[in-house]
């Protein structure tokens, strides 16, 4: 059940924007009758009741997402491709197929403390998305410093690493946005594969694009074992693997 969402991003575009009238060059605002219908739908969605819910399985493992995730949809460029959203599925499916629920963490929400509540391990990759603001790295680094475990998967070789953005303009000379993040956590700009300490937390670097975890049969074992080992060391318990999920919502199972 999807019950956590933003009903209408940018309402000013809907109610105050000008839209072309079909078959003419004229523009006008949204028709009054349609705006009334739209507002009725908005109010209904705002009032949908929710209940406490829980998915069985090991909790506290998340995968980082960003608004830029859908920007990199060019199928093939300079010999690099990410077919069928494979980099995202490479981070999530190896866990889901073992019965481990995955929490999706939105980078744009990192300024809010509630974003990291209950989170022990965060997996991320810049192979399929890029940070739109450098400030997000401050929040990620601070979470690690306080005890979080960050697992970075990626070779940083996709062509989008070289687009003109904040990490390579205005005096910044980073070859990839991850270099800025690693530097924030007192690591070298391009650390090799391995485990590093930062404050009370840990940074684990895996130099393989996550798409390979699903595009190559049986290639997700190392990825899973890395997460399982990190979880065991932090929590003192083994990750629970199973072949099913049970959703408990209110009085229902």
Give the predicted meaning of each segment.
Residues 1-90, 188-194, 203-247, 253:
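Hydrophobic targeting/anchoring helices
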Residues 2, 118-121, 147:
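Short, well-ordered alpha-helix to beta-strand connector turns
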């Amino acid at each position: 059940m999807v019950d956590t969402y933003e009903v209408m991003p940018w309402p000013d575009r809907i109610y105050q924007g000008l839209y072309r009238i079909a078959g003419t060059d004229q523009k006008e605002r949204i028709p009054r009758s349609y705006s009334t219908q739209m507002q009725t739908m908005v109010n209904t969605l705002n009032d949908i009741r929710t209940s406490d819910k829980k998915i069985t399985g090991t909790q506290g493992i998340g995968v980082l997402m960003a608004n830029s995730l859908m920007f990199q949809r060019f199928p093939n460029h300079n010999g690099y491709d990410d077919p069928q959203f494979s980099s995202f599925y490479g981070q999530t499916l190896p866990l889901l197929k073992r019965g481990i629920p995955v929490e999706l963490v939105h980078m744009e929400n990192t300024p809010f403390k509630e974003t990291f509540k209950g989170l022990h391990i965060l997996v991320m990759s810049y192979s399929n998305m890029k940070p739109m603001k450098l400030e997000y790295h401050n929040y990620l680094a601070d979470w690690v410093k306080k005890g979080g475990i960050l697992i970075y998967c990626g070779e940083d070789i996709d062509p989008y690493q070289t687009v003109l953005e904040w990490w390579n303009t205005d005096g910044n000379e980073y070859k990839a946005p991850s270099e800025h993040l690693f530097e924030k956590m007192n690591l070298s700009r391009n650390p090799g594969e391995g485990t590093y300490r930062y404050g009370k937390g840990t940074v684990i670097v895996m130099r393989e694009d996550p798409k390979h975890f699903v595009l190559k049969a049986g290639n997700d074992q190392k990825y899973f074992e890395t997460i399982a080992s990190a979880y065991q060391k932090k929590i003192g318990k083994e990750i629970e693997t199973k072949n099913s999920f049970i959703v408990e919502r209110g009085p229902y199972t």
